[in-house]
From Swiss-Prot:
Listed pathway(s): Porphyrin-containing compound metabolism; protoheme biosynthesis; protoheme from protoporphyrin-IX: step 1/1
Pfam families per the UniProt record, alphabetical: Ferrochelatase
Gene3D superfamilies attached to this UniProt entry: 3.40.50.1400
Protein name, as recorded: Ferrochelatase
Organism expressing this protein natively: Shewanella denitrificans (strain OS217 / ATCC BAA-1090 / DSM 15013)
Job of this protein: Catalyzes the ferrous insertion into protoporphyrin IX.
Transmembrane segments: none
Signal peptide: none
Any GO CC annotation of this UniProt entry: cytoplasm
Keywords on record: Cytoplasm, Heme biosynthesis, Iron, Lyase, Metal-binding, Porphyrin biosynthesis
NCBIfam families the UniProt entry points to: hemH
Length: 338
């Protein structure tokens, strides 16, 4: 393809990834790729690889496969199915609004997963072959974190390092305080309250990370707390009345024995129930699409924790997924770079 024909803009949506199937072998392949990323596990490389291949990949895949089986749908992995809908709806919205690039050409929307399929390398090759020379990357991690956002950038950079002709690159690294994002979160919470009534507490559960990462300079914790603060402010602006302890922030999905960001979600739910809280709603602002960590860990596992500790009503508020206001948010995020 001649360089004169390379005059197109493409948007690349990225998320973490998923096994191809809820089987032990598929989960083992996925975990091997995911847990081999030095951004994800920051301990001496040789030691970790020995632990990973000698212990974890022998034990964890079968257990995880059983959990994936519990959330698998006819469309396959919920995360992948939702991500594909996000891609299609964003493409439809850009076309409908006639949002073109600076050359007046239509913008194409693509999808890649950091681990698993569709891979970053495969998707970017397709974009390259389509003549895209202005690349806008939107990792769907609202709060920047090195293990997620920076790892997504690593994958982009690794792929581009093999190319001779590089595109212009715009990488949207965080949107934790974006007005459209906060408004979309509020709308999903308000819709639940309108349908089911006000709970006694609203728990905002974010994905956790080792506390060490915070001390090393990762802003993730601060970004999560800012998201919570802005959601509270939005709720107050919209006239919701609640006590100062109504919204609680916690962190889930801890792995290993190291100290992670606290308070932990399961411990928090147990404590709230033991204190007499009977009705709770839980939202997970760090997840742009429902996945194992929301559909199984929160909606099933942590529901049991709360009910077992004396709670009576546990409501999980779905991720923003392919909600219309979430798609508009994505469009507004990428629009300045088209």
């Amino acid at each position: 393809m001649g360089h004169t024909k390379r005059n197109k803009t493409g948007v690349l949506l990225m998320n973490l990834g998923t096994p191809d199937a809820p089987t032990t072998s598929a989960v083992r392949r996925y975990l091997a790729e995911f847990l081999s990323d030095p951004r994800v596990v920051e301990i001496p490389r040789l030691l970790w690889l020995l632990i990973l291949h000698g212990i974890i990949l022998r034990i964890r895949p079968a257990k995880s496969a059983a959990l994936y089986k519990g959330i698998w749908t006819e469309a396959g992995s919920p995360l992948l199915a939702i991500s594909e809908r996000q891609q299609a709806k964003l493409q439809g919205y850009l076309d409908e609004q006639q949002l073109t690039d600076k050359n007046g050409q239509a913008v194409s929307v693509h999808l890649a997963m950091r681990y698993g399929s569709p891979s970053v390398q495969q998707t970017m090759l397709q974009m390259h072959q389509a003549g895209i020379d202005n690349l806008v990357v939107l990792p769907l991690y609202p709060q920047y974190a090195a293990p997620t956002t920076a790892s997504a950038f690593d994958a982009i950079a690794k792929t581009l390092s093999q190319w001779r002709y590089l595109p212009s690159l715009h990488f949207i690294h965080t949107y934790h305080d974006n007005d459209d994002y906060i408004s979309a979160l509020f709308a999903s919470i308000k819709a639940d309250f309108d349908t089911n009534g006000m709970p006694e507490r609203l728990l905002l559960s974010y994905h956790g990370m080792p506390e060490r990462n915070l001390h090393l300079g990762d802003p993730y914790y601060c970004f999560c707390m800012k998201t919570t603060r802005l959601v509270i402010e939005k709720m107050q602006q919209q006239g919701l009345v609640f006590d100062s302890d109504f919204v609680v922030t916690s962190f889930q999905s801890r792995f290993g024995k190291a100290k992670w960001l606290q308070p932990y979600t399961d411990v928090t739910l147990e404590a709230l129930a033991s204190e007499g809280v009977r009705k709770i709603a839980v939202a997970c602002p760090a997840f742009s699409a429902d996945c194992l960590e929301t559909l199984e860990e929160i909606e099933q596992e942590n529901r049991e924790v709360f009910i077992h500790a004396g709670g009576e009503s546990f409501r999980y508020i779905s991720a923003l997924n392919d909600n219309d206001d979430h798609i508009v948010m994505m469009a507004n995020l990428v629009k300045p770079y088209l």
